[in-house]
């Protein structure tokens, strides 16, 4: 079942009727920042950044590798490297470690620093390693596929290799993300397509949206309570 059929079925059974107004439309999805990504676990890193800009268009996911080492470096380590370059912090939005752990990099809704001339409309994923000489682990490929599917779900992109998912070398004159990873990206994106159309991912997406709606309603209720309290206080005789 693909994503469109799944959402249509949810609407028919009544779930979508309650939640669908909280799904962003195609234009809104380009800048929408969810409370969580569906179907993947992101390890927080609590990094401190310099000044960042919001990204208002998202139409492509760009894949990178570390390149200068095949070591299992962390987002915190890359953050220090990029700070040393005079940047605001790590330029990638996500890192995929050797064991498949996905680490948080630059905040997802901000402009990255990972692909020259194309940062304002792209999300950057770094799969850790030097893939000119080595190959990615199975855990990395699996996590990258699920992360791509989750991002495509949020930004309403169809995961298509060479269109909405590309390698760094497709934009700039570079070997990144390495010949061995680049050769495997079509297969990784195909796995992402399968997961993208799964009931599992879309059910999780609905759960997150429902949670966001409940939190928004709670915030509105708290705001109404504060406003009423202020009005009552101001309306009392001195």
Regions found by a protein language model. Give the residues of each.
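Basic/polar, cationic surfaces and motifs that engage anionic cell-wall
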Residues: 2, 8-11, 19-22, 26-58, ...
């Amino acid at each position: 079942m693909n994503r469109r059929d799944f959402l249509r079925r949810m609407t028919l059974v009544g779930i979508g009727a309650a939640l669908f107004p909280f799904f962003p439309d195609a234009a809104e999805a380009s800048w929408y920042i969810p409370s969580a990504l569906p179907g993947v676990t992101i390890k927080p890193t609590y990094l401190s950044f310099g000044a960042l800009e919001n990204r208002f268009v998202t139409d492509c996911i760009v894949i990178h590798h570390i390149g200068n080492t095949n070591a299992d470096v962390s987002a915190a380590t890359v953050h220090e490297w990029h700070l040393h370059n005079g940047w605001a912090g790590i330029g990638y939005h996500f890192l995929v470690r050797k064991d498949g752990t996905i680490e948080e990099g630059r905040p997802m809704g901000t402009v990255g620093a990972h692909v020259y001339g194309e940062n304002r409309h792209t999300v950057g994923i770094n799969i850790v390693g030097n893939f000119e000489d080595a190959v990615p682990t199975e855990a990395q490929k699996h996590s990258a596929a699920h992360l791509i599917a989750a991002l495509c779900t949020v930004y309403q992109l169809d995961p298509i290799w060479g269109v909405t998912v590309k390698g760094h070398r497709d934009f700039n004159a570079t070997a990144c993300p390495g010949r061995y990873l680049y050769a495997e990206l079509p297969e990784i994106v195909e796995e992402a397509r399968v997961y993208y159309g799964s009931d599992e991912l879309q059910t999780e997406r609905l759960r997150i949206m429902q949670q966001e709606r409940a939190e928004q309603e709670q915030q509105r209720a708290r705001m109404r309570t504060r406003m009423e309290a202020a009005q009552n206080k101001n309306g009392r005789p001195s």
